[in-house]
Amino acid sequence: MGSFQKGIFLALCGLRLIQGTVVLSVAEPENNQIKDRALYTYPYTCPSILVGTGDTCDDLASRCSISAASFTSFNPTTGCSSLPRGKPVCCGPGETRFPPDSGGYCYAYTIRDGDTCAKIAEGYKITTADIETWNTNTSAWYGCNKLQQGGQVCLSKGEPSMPVAIGGAVCGPQVPGTARPILWTSIASLNPCPAGQCCSTKGQCGTGKDFCDSSAPAAAAPPAPATKAKSAVSEAKAATANEVTSVKTTSAPAAIAPPVPATKAISTSSTTKATSAASETKGAPLSARSFVTMTAAAVTVTVKAASTTKNADPHAFTTDIPLVDVPLTFLHPEDTKSAPAAAQTKAATGDVADFLKPAKEISILASQLRNNLVSTTTSVTKATGAAKSKAPSENSQTKKSPTQTVNGVVTVPSGWSLKMFDGIGCTGSYVLLQGHNKKLEDSTCMKFRSASTLQTDVTDTAVSCRWWTIPESGNWEWRDCHSNSLNRPKSWIMSNGLCTVSPNTKCDLVSDISQTYGWRGPGLCQDRKTVDPTFGSLKCYVG
């Protein structure tokens, strides 16, 4: 080979080397951009974006910072001629469907008011057939035609999660604190009822069609709040020997009386006519909506009021009852449930051991204590002033304060609350959101940082937000949520309601991927998982 041919050969090799270097220099930034862009916050297996109004495949490829050919290879089934708004598309290898998590469990979705399988499938870009297939083993799954509000369904392959706990449930897998069985086929046998009774879909034992009917209930919405109930003692006068006293409720609001001291309650029960009737009803099954009423003798909770300073310790008492928190998924917290007279007679005889056996009764007691905490803890009144104050007349009614101040923290006992922590395991600084609205449509779109309109004052007419931190001084302090907040909390506690979170800032719960969080039972703390979205905006309600 002559020198001229060698020169040509070396020149060609140099050009190939330069071309390869250019290709590498172009390809590497493309991959880095895909990994580094903050846009990819949606819980998919591939880095993805959502199709916007009027987007073309070229527009989407440009937003992904990749070539049109790469976009086509990552989305082989996407038709560029018809791109529906809100459809997720991949900017890298993978697929947009949710995979099972690291434990093999499915991606769980909490049913909200107004949900249908068609709406859920459209929002998560799956099919109704997928939902039916993935939920064949889900507890309390009755098909797409009978979705149960507050229940959970699988939106991916994997083992179903435990059903959401129901406050006051006494049987079945939805009793608060029930652990997952080793064999999923054993879930129906958890917390069985006594012999001869069946467990209803609401977790109550009894007999008859409402308890022993294996068919699914009608699509259920949460019951309407009932804040006025007749006393079981007075109702027992008309009860027969083999009947359980019924509970009559009205929708008219009424003040809830504070709990009666234990000694007084026992003496009153023993002198009423209900005692003899109650003893005859012993052993009768409870109705589906009954709760065992326990007197204040079972547990004593001492609440001390303190000054309302910003440095007060917020952990001493908040919206959660000490020891156990009992927000309800299906039952409103202000519902007053009268017990069968048999339960009161049992309390009067002093059988305290029965109160300590099942955890469900402790939960019920905590719920009633929360509803009956008196508003007098909002301020410290001198003993001399209390002695001079007039006793209220028998016909007068005292309106219960919607807010309480305990150890410097103002709370709304009958409302919902959400604590979002910056540490795993619900530790560290946190944002405390509190409200009172009962329905999702009554909630305003809540946002943080400069767009926030949330106030720090806790009232019964608006949502409040406080950002609690511990500065170098070592004392807890709070400030507003306008400048500092958490849009990706590492853990959170949802009490007495549900919050629907959306990664956008417009509370767009249809076109974007949203998730609903509710009370999960004792322990309460929920740590962030890879499938949890950014907390861009949210709506919360008692539910």
UniProtKB/Swiss-Prot annotation:
InterPro entries: Chitin-bd_1, Chitin-binding_1_CS, Endochitinase-like_sf, LysM12-like, LysM_dom, LysM_dom_sf. Residues 1-20 form the signal peptide. Residues 47-91, 107-155 form the LysM domain. The gene is LysM6. Pfam families: Chitin_bind_1 (PF00187), LysM (PF01476), LysM14_C (PF25139). Glycans are attached at N137. The LysM (lysin motif) domains are small globular domains involved in binding chitin in eukaryotes. LysM6 contains 2 LysM domains. Disruption phenotype: Shows no significant difference in the expansion rate of lesion diameters in apples fruits. Keywords: Chitin-binding, Glycoprotein, Repeat, Secreted, Signal, Virulence. This is Secreted LysM effector LysM6. The lineage of its organism: Eukaryota, Fungi, Dikarya, Ascomycota, Pezizomycotina. One of its GO terms (molecular function) is chitin binding. It is found in: Secreted. Residues 392-406 have a biased composition (Polar residues). Residues 383-406 are annotated as: Disordered. Secreted LysM effector that might have a role in sequestration of chitin oligosaccharides (breakdown products of fungal cell walls that are released during invasion and act as triggers of host immunity) to dampen host defense.
